[in-house]
Curated annotation (Swiss-Prot):
It catalyses: a quinone + NADH + 5 H(+)(in) = a quinol + NAD(+) + 4 H(+)(out). NDH-1 is composed of 13 different subunits. Subunits NuoA, H, J, K, L, M, N constitute the membrane sector of the complex. It is an enzyme of class 7 (translocase). The chain crosses the membrane at residues 11-31, 81-101, 114-134, 154-174, 186-206, 237-257, 265-285, 304-324. Belongs to the complex I subunit 1 family. Its main location: membrane. This is NADH-quinone oxidoreductase subunit H. GO terms for cellular component: membrane; NADH dehydrogenase complex; plasma membrane; respiratory chain complex I. It is a multi-pass membrane protein. It comes from Escherichia coli (strain K12). Its EC number is 7.1.1.-. InterPro entries: NADH_UbQ_OxRdtase_su1/FPO, NADH_UbQ_OxRdtase_su1_CS. The keyword DNA-binding does not apply.
Length: 325
């Protein structure tokens, strides 16, 4: 068959990788929502969801059916186009951010030379979804939550990007595969410990997870910028949040903990185990820490995280220049 060229085979293999990896990411995000409720019940000495299926194993299926059949209601005075577009942008931007993550040698959807810049671009695109949702809902709580979320996300994305510059300087590349290969002897978490701490804090803030969930604070804003959403539109926001957790956890593993590298076990297993550990940390943080005031969150970012990232970057640059002499 002369029409089957090597280029076509390469394109088909890339599409297959994309479908497999993205389906796994969506599935992990969905199962994390169930696992979080079970673990929070364990941490708080109460029962989690345990009524549907054996030990609550079918709770996720029940939630999906319930959400699918809920009324897809749009407020009367909202901007219908932007209101509908917002959850789609939120879901796809967070999903596309995972495309640059190499889960094992040769298994990456988009092996870009500007991989880290692509991730930061997708993280910035998610801000538009929040602003669109808050403004188009024509609800004061929704708008206030969107303003909080956009200010918080844009602030912490500064620290998110600066915390990665030390890793980029050490690896000499923005390519994620090159960064993983540069950690063959020493993981970046050792020389870039303060960069990792800042990236972890900023990652939690960008995902709007507890204790940085002020944009969705139920006690203050009645669920924030997606208060008017229901049905599958709310489902896209809901699953998108957990996909963001999976993506940030995978990036922590890739950038600071050697990616797929490890002894004995296959590379994909090492990557999955490391990522699952950091996903567990997200849940443990939610169960352990109180929610600070919004002004405290912003003050912490600009007065502590920013100086820490700048000091880390200056020290990294000084060490690289000293080694080059």
């Amino acid at each position: 068959m002369s029409w089957i060229s090597p280029e076509l085979i390469e394109i088909l293999l890339t599409i297959l990788k994309a479908v497999v990896i993205l389906l796994v990411v969506v599935t992990c995000g969905a199962f994390m929502s169930f696992g979080e409720r079970r673990l929070l019940g364990l941490f708080q000495n109460r029962y989690g969801p345990n009524r549907v299926g054996w030990g609550g194993s079918l709770q996720l299926v029940a939630d999906m059916i319930k959400m699918f059949f809920k009324e897809d209601w749009i407020p009367k005075f909202s901007d219908r186009v932007i209101f509908t577009l917002a959850p789609m942008i939120a879901f796809t931007s967070l999903l596309l951010a995972f495309a640059i993550v190499p889960v094992s040698p040769g298994w990456v959807v988009a092996d870009l030379n500007i991989g880290i810049l692509f991730f930061l671009m997708m993280a910035g695109l998610a801000v538009y979804a929040v602003l669109f949702a808050g403004w188009s809902s024509n609800n004061k709580y929704s708008l206030l939550g969107a303003m909080r979320a956009s200010a918080q996300t844009l602030s912490y994305e500064v620290f998110l990007g600066l915390s990665l510059m030390g890793v980029v300087a050490q690896a000499g590349s923005f390519n994620m595969t090159d960064i993983v290969n540069s950690q063959a002897h020493v993981w970046n978490v050792i020389p870039q410990f303060f960069g990792f701490i800042t990236f972890a804090i900023a990652g939690v803030a960008v995902c709007h997870r507890h204790p940085f969930d002020q944009p969705e604070a139920e006690q203050e804003l009645a669920d924030g910028y997606h208060i008017e959403y229901s049905g599958m539109k709310f489902g896209l926001f809901f699953v998108g949040e957990y996909i963001g957790i999976v993506t940030i956890s995978a990036l922590m593993v890739t950038l600071f903990f050697g990616g797929w590298q490890g002894p004995l076990l296959p590379p994909f297993i090492w990557f999955a185990l490391k990522t699952a550990f950091f996903m567990m940390m997200f849940i443990l943080i939610r169960a352990s820490l109180p929610r600070p005031r919004y002004d405290q969150v912003m003050s912490f970012g600009w007065k502590i995280c920013l100086p820490l990232t700048l000091i880390n970057l200056l020290v990294t640059a000084a060490v690289i220049l000293w080694q080059a002499q």
